From Swiss-Prot:
Its EC number is 2.1.1.319. The gene is PRMT3. This is Probable protein arginine N-methyltransferase 3. Residues 253-582 form the SAM-dependent MTase PRMT-type domain. It is found in: Cytoplasm, Cytosol. Its main location: cytoplasm. Residues 1-45 are annotated as: Disordered. It holds the Pfam family ANM3_C2H2_Zf. Residues 1-17 have a biased composition (Basic and acidic residues). Belongs to the class I-like SAM-binding methyltransferase superfamily. Protein arginine N-methyltransferase family. The C2H2-type zinc-finger is responsible for substrate specificity. It catalyses: L-arginyl-[protein] + S-adenosyl-L-methionine = N(omega)-methyl-L-arginyl-[protein] + S-adenosyl-L-homocysteine + H(+); L-arginyl-[protein] + 2 S-adenosyl-L-methionine = N(omega),N(omega)-dimethyl-L-arginyl-[protein] + 2 S-adenosyl-L-homocysteine + 2 H(+). S-adenosyl-L-homocysteine binds at residues 275, 299, 321, 323, 364. It comes from Oryza sativa subsp. japonica (Rice).
Amino acid sequence: MATREHELRPEQERLGEDREEYEDGEEEEEEGEEGWDDWESDGDDAGGGGGGGGLLCLFCSARFDSESSLFSHCASEHRFDFYRVVKETGMDFYGCIKLINFVRSKVAENKCWSCGQVFSSNSELCGHLHALEIPQLEGKVPWGDDVYLKPFLEDDSLLHSLSVFDDDDEDDCGMPMEKGGCSAGNGSLAETCESNLKSIINDGSDVIDRFERTCTIESTDGECSGSLAQEPSDKQLKIARASAAARGIKSVDESYFGSYSSFGIHREMLGDKVRTEAYRDALLGNPSLMNGATVLDVGCGTGILSLFAAKAGASRVIAVDGSAKMVSVATEVAKSNGFLYDENMEMQQKRDTQVITVVHTKAEELNHKIQVPSNKFDVLVSEWMGYCLLYESMLSSVLYARDHFLKPGGAILPDTATIFGAGFGKGGTSLPFWENVYGFDMSCIGKEVTGNSARFPVVDILASEDIVTETAVLNSFDLATMKENEMDFTSSFELRLSESGVSQSGVTWCYGIILWFDTGFTNRFCKEKPVNLSTSPFSTPTHWSQTIFTFEEPIAMAKEESAVVSSASVGTDECPAVMIRSRISIVRASEHRSIDISIETTGISSDGRKRSWPVQIFNL
């Protein structure tokens, strides 16, 4: 799947006395059946003990109008005394944020937040819940990781409503307020910070700079600055930055999913026969895997993979996509072809093929939208690959779905992926075109274009005859077992001139490195019909093309028997390199869904001399 759209350490704050007991929340939601036929969407109208309020309980679907009533309900119904935990652990504001997100994440996994025991359903979990033994923590809380600063639920109203740290103690200001103007100024400052914080949390506006200007400005009499302004600045800025980061991710995701809302990219992907037929053959050609299987399709798009799965005999298919437009389209497509599951239809009226349900959500939030039964899925299928394999970072969503929704021993399709690299010659650049444009020499333009290519990766299809070196394997991924951090890697490899790359003069110029990937539906899961999907320049072209990284200057190469001039620089006509030793690092970029690539290059001559070129950094 690819598109062409090219000090969180706050100071400790002291807590006052424990809060008073509040009104008990009402009864939790009734537990429903957990069979495959009873999946329901967890819409915004979820009922529960608190009626129609906006604050969702940490453990059940009850909603409340206030933080106090919610935590009173948690204490009485779920034995989770939030205020006691906060007081006894000495948590600051950020600790509270982390605790809430930690508990929500564990409950989503049907895991006890206190002892870690795992259950098959939310009802079993709620029946087990017990108070946390604070002394057993030995000073280290399990929610201490900064990862829990990121809201587990999108737009979690509870995080916006926390008042446990409302602070009326003048001592916390850091200096006495002797001037009347200071007192008034500080009140205005707090209001400004609160307003700006809400702006960041609610609409993702970039007002952090405004925070910093407001929180450090002196009062009109010039005598109220420094620590007085700094105290609210610290707390507000830190939560603002955390929230802004989360909003930045959300913004990129919205743009990403929005790019898949147009039909052009889907026409291109469906028309990619190599891609689509590989998935079709893997799903339809392995009946022992697919017949009667429950299937999760992550990033379903038009739903083509779900249709293949249903046609292959799957008993239930859940198709997930982050684009509301494509969810609507996939639903209509499934309905038009007689595969859409209708939960309102009587069982005797349903056909065996009516098995597909399409859900609008990210994979990471699936269990907030539907109730995933304890037996989970037999098969996870996804077309997640981007340019250079890892662009778009969709693999992390697939791995999350594998770890949370695929049953032990279940199949992930595809189950392997490999990145390859090779050196390419002049034909892989635009130089030949510019050297003869209707009989005119425009090579000056070609040189400028090639120079620009040395700063930006190019996604294009190269002809196999333009590959001048042997192929090297950069990295292989076992998608059934790999960890998310393995998406970031460094690979060292060597490139030697191939037989077909040798020119008549004996010297061949290598202009850069090209990367491509294969994915495998291996006989580990596809026993009847293993399939390999290749984006190699030696195979039929695909919509992924290849990813081209051009050197700042080309490197002359020759076979080992070539004579060299000892005084000449390695990689030149007089001293061609017999081998290029390269190290490539590919890591997820700070910009969500992008990747950074660094390339280190060293040429080695036949007499053993070496020459290294400056590191090149690319962003894709």
